Each structure stands twice: as C-alpha cells, then as structure tokens.
C-alpha cells in the first residue's frame, strides 16, 4: 500500500472515468465534524497532479449535504460525463463535468435539478452499458430510472414483492442493461427487470448469528447471474455471493469483519478482487471467487462508510471514513518499513518523527497478482530467429508454441552470404542497379562498384580525366594544329613514330636534322651591347657559372637555361629557382615546379579543387608508389567532399576514395546516408515489403555491408577494418550482425565480425562462437582455494585476454618434454628437501598478498637423490609463457565490501583456466597431517641453455637483478615497523624435510578470512646472503616459526601459532601456497633451484625459535628481538606537513570524497565511514612521508587527477596500474581509493 493522497473531508465521493481520474467529493449527510460546522460543499480533486494535490481544483458551497455522488462515463454531448448528486432533502442535481472543470461555475454547469423523490436519496448509479441512464433509490422504497439525455419524467421499475422502507443501495447488471438490483433495510435484495417492469427475484439470508440486513449490493463484472451483498448487522457482518440460478442460498460467505459492512466494490478489471469497509473501521481485500480474504489495509479512527476502485486505474482505490479523511491508496504495498521511515539516532527526534509517521502497514494473508498484471498471452523473439508464443486454453493452462520467424529483408542476407562464399558480387550489383526501390545515390554507388569490378580502379579516374579530350571536336584540333604549324611538319612516313610518342604529348620526327650553324659572323658587332659582350667573354672563357649568374642578374633566363643544360646540377637548380621566383604567380610556373621536382604535393594540396580532373591526372602520371598514390588521391577526395564548387562532389569524392582504397572514407559517407535511405524506403511506393522502421533499418544495413563486402572483394582487400572511422563503421556492422544472428544466420554474422577489431566486437564474436559451438578448446582448470583438501599443481596463468582471445591459446614450448596432462609425472633427480620452485619474477595473483618467491636461494648444493614417484598426478592446464596480470578484486563479500548499489553492472566474464598460487593471508594455527608425496617437476636439460625470463614490462624499478654480497653468516631477520594500518605478514610456510626422506607433507591451507585484510609485504633487500654452509645439512620435521605479526585492527582475534622446531635458521622454507608448486614454464625458471642467490626481493630467513636440533646440525642463531614500533613524526589527523609534491593527492581525494558522501545511501553509511578512514590512513602517510616513493606519488597523482576530472575509466585503469607497479607500498588505504572510484562512478 502506498498512500497517494489524504483528503481532510468527511465526504462521500465518486471517481471520474479518466485515465488519470479526478475525484468528486460532497459533504456527507448525517456527520458532524469537530467544529460542528453545518456547511456543505462540492469539490473536485486532481489526485495525480504534479503540482499540488492538497487543494481542490474546484470548490463550491451548496445548500444541503450529500448522501451519494455518481459520475458517468462520457456519452453524446457530455465529453467528460455527468456528475449526479443525491441530497438529504430528496433533490437530485446534475452537472456537466467538462463545463464545471473549465468554468469553475456551479450554476453554469448545472443541467438539471429534480425533486421527484419525496425523501432523502440514498444511492445513485449510472448504467455501465448505457452511460446516460441513471438509477436512484431513497426513502419510502422509491426507485427511479432517469434518462439524462432528455431528462424526461423518471419512471419506477415496478412494485416490490416486499415493501421496503428505505433503499440503501442500487446497482446495474454489468452484462444486461435492463437488469438492476436494489437492497434496503427490510433484509431483502430485489432483482428488477425493466423490460417487464417488475421485481423478478428477491434474496434474503438468515444464519446462525441472525438475519442479514443488506446495506450494499454489487454485480459480477462479467457474469450476469452473479452478485454480492453486504450486511451491516453487527451480529451478522457477512459478505454473501449469490448465483441467481440457485437463489435459495448464497454461494460463498465471506467472514472477517467484526462489525457491520457498509460498503463494497467489485473490481471491474479483475473479478477476483473485491474491496469492503465497515463499522469496524477496517478495509479488507477479498477474492470473492474463492471466498478468501487476501489482505487488510490500515484501519481508520471511525467507521469506513465508503470504498471504491478508480474505474480506469483499478490499482488505486479510495476509502472515506467518519474520522474526517478520504484516503487514496494503491492495492500493492511498496512502502518502506517504519524502521526506514524513522531514521534519527537522537531519542527526542526519534519520538517526534514516530509520532508524525504513518506506522500502519497493510497485512496480506495471501499474495495474489491482479488480473492486469498477469499475462494471458505473450510473445517473444528468441535468439536464432525463433518466435515463442504463450497462450491459454479454455482451462487456463498455458500453451507454448515455438516457430521459426522469417523477417522481411532476410532474403537479401541470404544472397549476400552466397556472394561472400563464392566471392562473386556480380548478381548483387546487377540487382541493386536495376532495383526500383534503391535511391539515386545508392544506384550511383553500385554503378561505380560495377565499373570498378569490370575495369579496375585505374580506369575509374582515366575515363574522367580523358573525357574532355575525347569530347574536343576534330575541327578544333585541326585548327590548333594549323595554328601551330604541326600538320605541315609531320610527313606520312612518320606515322608510327607519331603514334608512339603521342602518349608523351610531343612528336619527334625521324628525319628532323639537328641545328648546325653556318656562315660567318662577328663576335662583337656594332649592335652588341656591353652586357652581351661581358656575357660572351665569360662564356668563351669557360666561366659558365659566372655567366649563368650574370644572366640571372640581368634577367636573361633563356640564356641562363641554355648555359645550364650542360652545367652541374647545382647550376641547374640555381637557374630553376630563379625562374620560379620570377614567375611565382603564374599557373604554369606552379605546375612546372611540381613536375620538375617530381613531387606534386603542392598541386594536390593547393590547386583549385575545381580543376580536380587535372589534379587527378597529375597524381596518376607522377605518382608511382602505390601507398603515395592512395594517400594523394584520398586527400583529393577529402578536398572535393568538403568543397561546394565541384558538381556531384559526393560521387566524385567516392570515385577518388575507390581509386585510393580508402574504404573507411567511403563507408563513412554511406554510414551518414543510412537514415536518409531508411526514410526513402519507408516513403517509397515501390517498397511494398517495408512496413516498419525496423525492416527499413535491416534493409539499409544489409545494403551498407553489401557495398563494403563488394568493394573489399573487388579490390582484394583482407584484414580488419582500420582507420579513423573504424569505430562507427564497426558499430554499424555489429548492429547488422546482431540482427542477422537473431535471425539464425550465424555464419554470415561471423564472416562480418572477422572484419572488426577484437576490442570492438570481442563480445559478439564470443556470442556467435557459443551459438555455433565453435569455441576454441581451452583447457579449464578449477581454482584451488585456500581451504580445500585437494592438493594440485598450482599454475599462475596470464589472464589479461582470456575473454576475447579464446581461439589463440599459445602452446607451451615444453610440451615435448612433459608427460600428457593427467598422466603421472616422471620423477626427477632433484633434492628431496625442496619443492619445485616458481618463477621469481612472477607476482602473486593477489596484489595484497606478499610477493614471495618460492625459489630457495639459500638451499645448499645437495647430492642428487632420486625421489619416489608420485602416487597420483594432478591434471592442470599448461601455463602460458609470460607472467600473470595481477587481479585486484577479492571475492570476500564481507561486511566491509562495497554495497551492490555502487557495484558496476558489468557483464560476467568467463573464468580463465587459472590455478593461482597465493600464500594464505590468515595467520591461523596450522593443522598437522601425515606427509604425502609431492610430484617433482621434470628434469631440466642442461644443454637447453634456458635462462630465467626478464621481468615483465611495467615492473617496479627496484625489481632488478642484484649481485650478491658474500657474507660469513646468514643475515638476521629485518625489524618490521609496527604499523597498525599495514597488513600482517604471511605466517603460512612449509619447512623442508630430511635430505634423504620423501618430499615434505603439506598442511592444508586454512580458509581465507573475508574479514581480514591482505598480509603485509616483507621489506626487500638489495643483496641476498649466501648460505652459511653448503654441505652436511640435515633437516628436522618441523617448520620455521614466522615473525610475530603486528596487531590488525580489522581482523578478528586468531589463535596463537604453534612454533615448531627448526634445524637451520639459514634456510628459508618454501612458502605454503594453495597446493603443490606448478610444473615449469617454457623458460624453465619456475622449478630451477639456483646454486647461489641471484635475485633481489627474496625475504630473509625468519628468526630461529624452538629447541636445539640434532647434534649433527650447527647450533641455531639466537632469536631475534621483538620489533620495536616506530613512532610517527606527526600525530594522526595532522595535514599541515603534507609536502608540496603530495598536496594535490590530498586536495583531489578530499574534493571527490566530499562530493560522494552526501549521495551514499543511509544503510551504507558504515561503508562510507570506512572509506574515509582508509583515505585518512593515506593522508597520515603523506603527512609523515613514511610510505610512498616519489615515483609512486607521481603515479597516484595521475589517478587522482583523472578521478577529479570525472574520467572514471582512466582513473580505474591508472589505479590498476598503480597497484601492479607499486605493490610493495600498498596497504589498507589503497582499498579506499578503489572504493572511492567505484562510488564516484555510481554518482556521476
């Protein structure tokens, strides 16, 4: 129940028949309010108004009070129906509802007023089948039928069998318009037939508790022979259902009211819902068909004398009571509990809120959905062009029908698939060109594709660039030839030579003799100028360079060019530059410049695009490199497309793009035209098969991808779509593949998905692969958790691209030397005191777990001893060759986890075939189990030359290979800083067994505690010490005790750890992970035990604790002292000493936190407080400068900057990188930043 409105009136009411109904109220007769006010008013209320529902939209005073109100459905001449009022003085008045609402004038809206009744009128109802017919009943047993169209004299339905003193209720039959029922204080309910004008039947009931005194009657919404009556007798407060075919006794008796029932209403939209109210101040919801009470709504302070559903909104009903309220509420209860309404922690405020809060909630005994919320029939499209239909038979049972659905336009997709398989688009091209449905632009595109298929891309430009020459008339050519004198110089015998050289634009005649001067001449004649004399002297003196320079200075470029012909290249360039500088504004000079330099970039970029044909001819003539040609012709297409001076710029640009293999450019144009093509398909008279926008969209997308496929086939283009427009094109193709895949054409969808980059269509590819069963075989392995009893070989796998690169699983290079998966591993000649080691470069999959290498760098060079074969091999998937990508999500779901409100709704990713090898973070006591065999790793070939792999990209700067320093004794354990915010160190380690014994038994890991934080990362050392002794070392069966962990404020108290004996403190026991160490990787570094320390970052041995071991072992070093906690420089909460380099982190995080806090739901307040606490831990570290390095601070600044600028995606990515690169500096504070990013994402 949701209380929609509460009207402070003691009034009767009537609903309008509008979709959002209006409520009419009239002051009820016979009631006295607290002020003893005797006035009366008619009011209209817009309950669903968005502005103000506390005030009526109309109110007018009337002389007398009301017994009943009725509001008819719209009918002829009354668009919003009539309002009829029954007054206590026997008057019935009618108002036009529309006039009343618009004019707000009661007198103007009044259409009729009658005093036909001789006493008070108790009940009114309009006929549901004939909206203009009204029945009224009142005192003295008077019942009248009114025609509100003509307002003629009302008539009586006839004489009653048993006279009644007062009619309390009248009701029309909902199926037969001339049948009505009436009931009164005589204890009878009469059935009237207006056609025969007589009472045909009357009903009465006498039970064990007495005689029923009927107060209300209502007909079944759909069955003409069933009705229901209510008794207001306190001794017999019953609701009776009747079937007139057996009127001797009621069909059902509904018991539940403690006192008399005053009102009921049978829902017209659901015959299985009935609402009633009465003298016991209650309102009940019933199923009258079964006779069961469904629920009870909050009680009132006085009699609830009327209740009724809204005619067009049956989920809403109103109840009027004598406590001065009309409550409008909903059937369903969606209100929050009282505990959420009253939220104050202050006692005084709590009781104040409680006193003003509606604490009553409806109580439902039986949950039953209304008929309008049930689905009598349903239909749904299924994946693969399936259509599922659900319907009901005559017995109400569901019938499910699944059939194949063939969408319009699906035939085009089938033709496209055939063309793709045969690599032949000729039929599709011909069909598109001849189609009556295609637009002109679409046809022009297909014609270009046809020319491209027939002639090639070279001919596409050639036919355009040679059009004008072909159109030039022969007379014009001849006149030009005569003008130039060329025709006289070409004899008939030179025809062959002429045509051979015609393509070069010049004619060289075979018998043309070279120029040879003859006759005498003067070197210096009288007409020779001094300038020419100087030039002649320079030339004759073979000073060609000076002569050229002189010619250039005097502007004699012709002579300079002749002199430069046989000169050096520098002189030629000098002359050319002089020429171009002098004729810089001449068009021919710009063209000659590009031609002489064999680079037409200037022409392509700067020439007027109106001369695009000449530009295209130049590109064709002077560009020999295919990539350069494609680039320049595509640039020309861009300029044409942007130009407004070129006719048919769109088609011309596409022609250039086709010639330049610029598929992304062409597809961008086609993509922009998709909406226009869809509109054309919907408006075209020839497109008879297109009847909806979805069909037009499918046809347009099919046409789009068909063009792309045809062009790629014609141009022999392979590979994925790329370029600046790859993303929008890919989205359109993905949309098309979703449509055709939904029609069951998975092969066609898969073909087009292969054209798209994986980062844009990876999910769709997986979806199609699953549907077709073509998922690549990937060996799956179950993740071994820290609490399972099974022991498996643990493999840390790379999982960065598992969800997309399913079909490209690399094969490990060690495959030939390793037994098949699931087969027992051959025993290796390795010391039995060790277990197969891990790659020291591989990080733990949990970023909060300590980075511990399982390679024992302190292990002595022991003699090779053959280990016993394993009893049972464990099947694992082959590990990839690279280090893993860290995974930062912890599936703990503890009290401190982020609430679901803030979790992003990302689709579930497929689990990777990974077995993680992470030390257990919980320092709980170990359970001793009998030793069991560990399958040793395969023997490493000495001739393979395998070396440890380099660290992964992005690894920490301090993870470098360090040269070990030889020391005489093992280095003592480092003193840990007692930081209450840092996670505790790992306590789960295994001790090596006796050298000649079977492999050590492994204790089962304890279950991960969801409330405990990740363990502390041990401090790193630059140089690892060598072992104290390399011979004669024996081991006892005990394990080295871990150092005492610092107090963790977030973890529950744990039992004390049993400290077993240790035989040699100089040996670092391998860490206890979640099972036996995995097989080797292809580099062979995960199981090789080095002779001497070679890597930094390996934790030193823990302090020796326990009793003195066997006499053969050297005495252990003294136990380390308890770490002394280091006091912070500044108190907690101090922010005044945050250095300048870190203050930006503090400012940005504080700003985002203050923006997020007001939006945190109240029930997640604890999460918000925990978030702030974690950030304060970081701020304390920044203030004390005791945790983060400068590199870490800079990386964290990038995270905070992205978060402050609301770039959530970048912030999340940078935060992940930060955790991977600075794992040794993480703590409880980092979880706070991760949670802040997620909360900010939910808010923004």
Swiss-Prot record:
Q: How does it sit in the membrane?
A: Peripheral membrane protein
Name any Gene Ontology BP term.
COPII-coated vesicle cargo loading
The compartments listed are: Cytoplasmic vesicle, COPII-coated vesicle membrane; Endoplasmic reticulum membrane
Report biased composition (Pro residues) as residue ranges: 868-886
In the record for this protein, the WD repeats are positioned at 5-46, 61-105, 116-156, 162-202, 209-252, 256-296, 299-339, 380-403
The UniProt annotation puts the region (Disordered) at: 460-495, 794-820, 868-1007, 1066-1136
Coarse class of the primary localization is membrane
Please list the residue ranges that the record marks as compositionally biased, kind Basic and acidic residues. 469-486
Tell me the keywords, alphabetical order: Cytoplasmic vesicle, Endoplasmic reticulum, ER-Golgi transport, Membrane, Protein transport, Repeat, Transport, WD repeat
Task: Give the top-rank taxon of the lineage listed in the UniProt record for this protein.
Answer: Eukaryota
Cite the record's Low complexity compositional bias ranges.
Answer: 909-919
Gene Ontology MF terms: structural molecule activity
A cellular component annotation (GO) from this entry = endoplasmic reticulum exit site
Sequence ranges of Polar residues compositional bias: 794-816, 991-1007
Q: Which residues form a coiled coil?
A: none
Q: Which Pfam families match?
A: SRA1, WD40
Function per UniProt: Component of the coat protein complex II (COPII) which promotes the formation of transport vesicles from the endoplasmic reticulum (ER). The coat has two main functions, the physical deformation of the endoplasmic reticulum membrane into vesicles and the selection of cargo molecules.
Q: Which family does it belong to?
A: Belongs to the WD repeat SEC31 family.
**Assembly mode:** The COPII coat is composed of at least 5 proteins: the SEC23/24 complex, the SEC13/31 complex, and the protein SAR1. SEC13 and SEC31 make a 2:2 tetramer that forms the edge element of the COPII outer coat. The tetramer self-assembles in multiple copies to form the complete polyhedral cage. Interacts (via WD 8) with SEC13.
This protein is called Protein transport protein SEC31
* Organism annotation: Scheffersomyces stipitis (strain ATCC 58785 / CBS 6054 / NBRC 10063 / NRRL Y-11545)
Taxon lineage: Eukaryota, Fungi, Dikarya, Ascomycota, Saccharomycotina
């Amino acid at each position: 129940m949701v209380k929609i409105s509460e009207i402070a009136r003691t009034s009767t009411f009537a609903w309008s028949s509008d979709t959002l109904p209006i409520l009419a109220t009239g002051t009820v007769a016979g009631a006295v309010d607290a002020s003893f006010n005797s006035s009366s008013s008619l009011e209209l209320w817009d309950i669903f108004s968005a502005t103000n529902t506390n005030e009526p939209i109309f109110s007018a005073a009337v002389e007398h009070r009301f017994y009943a109100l009725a509001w008819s459905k719209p009918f002829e001449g009354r668009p919003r129906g009539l309002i009829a009022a029954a007054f206590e003085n026997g008057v019935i008045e009618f108002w036009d509802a529309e006039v009343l609402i618009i004019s707000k004038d009661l007198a103007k809206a009044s259409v009729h007023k009658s005093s036909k009744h001789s006493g008070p009128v108790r009940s009114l109802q309009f006929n549901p089948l004939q909206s203009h017919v009204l029945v009224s009943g009142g005192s003295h047993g008077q019942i009248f039928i009114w025609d509100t169209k003509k307002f003629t004299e009302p008539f009586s339905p006839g004489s009653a069998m048993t006279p009644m003193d007062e009619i309390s209720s009248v009701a029309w039959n909902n199926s037969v318009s001339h049948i009505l029922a009436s009931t009164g204080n005589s204890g009878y309910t009469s059935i009237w037939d207006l056609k025969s004008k007589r009472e045909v039947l009357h009903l009465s009931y006498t039970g064990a508790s007495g005689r029923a005194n009927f107060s209300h009657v209502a007909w079944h919404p759909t069955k003409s022979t069933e009705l229901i009556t209510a008794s207001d007798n306190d001794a017999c407060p019953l609701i009776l259902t009747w079937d007139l075919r057996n009127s001797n006794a009621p069909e059902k008796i509904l018991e539940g009211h403690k006192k008399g029932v005053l009102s009921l209403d049978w829902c017209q939209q659901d015959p299985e819902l009935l609402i009633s109210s009465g003298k016991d101040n209650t309102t009940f919801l019933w199923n009258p068909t079964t006779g069961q009470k469904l629920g009870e709504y909050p009680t009132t302070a006085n009699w609830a004398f009327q209740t009724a559903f809204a005619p067009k909104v049956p989920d809403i009903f109103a109840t009027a009571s004598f406590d001065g309220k009309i409550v409008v509420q909903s059937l369903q209860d969606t209100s929050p509990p009282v505990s959420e309404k009253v939220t104050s922690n202050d006692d005084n405020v709590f009781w104040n809120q409680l006193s003003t809060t509606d604490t009553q909630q409806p109580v439902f005994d039986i949950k039953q959905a209304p008929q309008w919320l049930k689905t009598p029939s349903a239909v749904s499209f299924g994946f693969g062009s399936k259509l599922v239909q659900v319907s009901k038979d005559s017995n109400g049972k569901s019938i499910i029908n699944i059939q194949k659905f063939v969408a319009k336009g699906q035939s085009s997709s089938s033709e496209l698939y055939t063309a793709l398989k045969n690599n032949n688009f000729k039929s599709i091209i011909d069909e598109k060109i001849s189609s009556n449905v295609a637009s002109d632009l679409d046809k022009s595109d297909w014609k270009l594709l046809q020319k491209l298929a027939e002639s090639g891309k070279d001919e596409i430009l050639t036919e355009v660039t040679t059009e004008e020459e072909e159109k030039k008339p022969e007379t014009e050519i001849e006149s030009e030839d005569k003008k130039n004198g060329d025709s006289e110089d070409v004899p008939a015998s030179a025809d062959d030579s002429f045509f051979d050289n015609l393509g070069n634009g010049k004619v060289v005649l075979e018998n043309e003799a070279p120029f040879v001067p003859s006759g005498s001449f003067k070197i210096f004649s009288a007409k020779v100028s001094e300038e020419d004399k100087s030039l002649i002297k320079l030339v004759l003196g073979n000073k060609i360079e000076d002569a050229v320079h002189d010619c250039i200075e005097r502007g004699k470029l012709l002579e300079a060019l002749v002199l430069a012909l046989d000169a050096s290249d520098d002189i030629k360039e000098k002359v050319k530059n002089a020429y171009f500088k002098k004729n810089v504004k001449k068009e021919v000079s710009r063209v000659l410049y590009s031609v002489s330099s064999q680079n037409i970039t200037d022409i392509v970029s700067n020439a007027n695009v109106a001369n695009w044909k000449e530009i295209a001819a130049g590109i064709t003539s002077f560009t020999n490199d295919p990539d350069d040609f494609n680039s320049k012709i595509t640039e020309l297409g861009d300029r044409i497309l942007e130009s407004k001076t070129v006719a048919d710029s769109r088609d011309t640009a596409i022609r250039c793009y086709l010639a330049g293999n610029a598929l992304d450019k062409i597809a961008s144009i086609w993509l922009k035209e998709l909406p226009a093509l869809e509109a054309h398909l919907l408006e075209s008279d020839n497109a008879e098969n297109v009847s909806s926008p979805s069909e037009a969209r499918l046809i347009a997308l099919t046409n789009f991808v068909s063009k792309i496929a045809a062009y790629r086939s014609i141009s022999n283009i392979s590979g994925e779509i790329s370029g600046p427009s790859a993303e929008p094109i890919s989205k359109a193709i993905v949309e098309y593949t979703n449509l055709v895949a939904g029609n069951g054409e998975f092969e066609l969808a898969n073909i087009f998905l292969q054209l798209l980059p994986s980062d844009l269509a990876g999910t769709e590819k997986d979806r199609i692969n699953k549907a077709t069963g073509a998922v690549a075989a990937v060996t799956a392995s179950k993740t071994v958790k820290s609490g399972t009893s099974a022991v498996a070989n643990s493999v840390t796998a790379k999982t960065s691209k598992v969800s997309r690169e399913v079909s490209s699983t690399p094969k490990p290079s060690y495959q030939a030397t390793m037994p098949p998966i699931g087969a027992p591993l051959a025993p290796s000649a390795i010391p039995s005191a060790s277990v197969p080691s891990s790659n020291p470069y591989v990080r733990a999959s949990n970023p909060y777990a300590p980075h511990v290498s399982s390679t024992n760098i302190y292990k002595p060079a022991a003699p090779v001893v053959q280990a016993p074969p394993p009893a049972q091999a464990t099947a694992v998937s082959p590990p990839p060759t690279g280090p893993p990508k860290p995974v930062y999500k912890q599936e703990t779901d503890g009290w401190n986890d982020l609430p679901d409100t803030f979790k992003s709704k990302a689709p579930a990713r497929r689990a990777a075939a990974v077995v993680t090898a992470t030390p257990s973070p919980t320092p709980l006591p170990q359970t001793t189990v009998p030793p069991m065999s560990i399958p040793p790793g395969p023997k490493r070939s000495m001739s393979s030359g395998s070396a440890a792999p380099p660290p992964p990209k992005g690894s920490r700067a301090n993870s470098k290979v360090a040269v070990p320093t030889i020391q005489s004794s093992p280095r003592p354990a480092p003193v840990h800083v007692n930081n209450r915010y840092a996670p505790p160190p790992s306590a789960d380690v295994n001790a090596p067994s006796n050298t000649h014994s079977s492999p050590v038994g492994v204790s089962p890991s304890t279950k991960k505690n969801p409330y405990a934080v990740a363990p502390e990362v041990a401090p790193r050392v630059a140089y690892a010490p060598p072992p104290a002794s390399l011979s004669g070392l024996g081991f006892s069966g005990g394990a080295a005790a871990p150092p005492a962990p610092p107090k963790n404020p977030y973890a529950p108290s744990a039992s004390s750890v049993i400290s077993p004996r240790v035989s040699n403190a100089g040996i670092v026991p391998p860490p206890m992970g979640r099972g036996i160490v995995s097989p080797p990787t292809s580099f062979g570094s995960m199981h090789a035990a080095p002779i001497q320390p070679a890597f930094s970052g390996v934790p030193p041995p823990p302090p020796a604790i326990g009793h003195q071991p066997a006499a053969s072992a050297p005495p252990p070093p003294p136990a380390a002292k308890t770490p002394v906690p280091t006091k912070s420089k500044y108190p907690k909460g101090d922010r005044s000493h945050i250095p300048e380099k870190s203050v930006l982190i503090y400012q940005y995080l504080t700003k985002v936190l203050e923006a997020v806090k007001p939006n945190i739901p109240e029930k997640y307040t604890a999460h918000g407080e925990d978030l702030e606490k974690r950030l304060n831990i970081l701020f304390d570290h920044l203030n004390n400068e005791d945790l983060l390095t400068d590199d870490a601070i800079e990386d964290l600044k990038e995270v905070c900057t992205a978060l402050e600028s609301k770039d959530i995606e970048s912030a999340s990515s940078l935060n992940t990188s930060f955790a991977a690169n600075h794992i040794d500096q993480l703590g409880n504070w980092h979880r706070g930043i991760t949670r802040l990013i997620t909360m900010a994402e939910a808010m923004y």
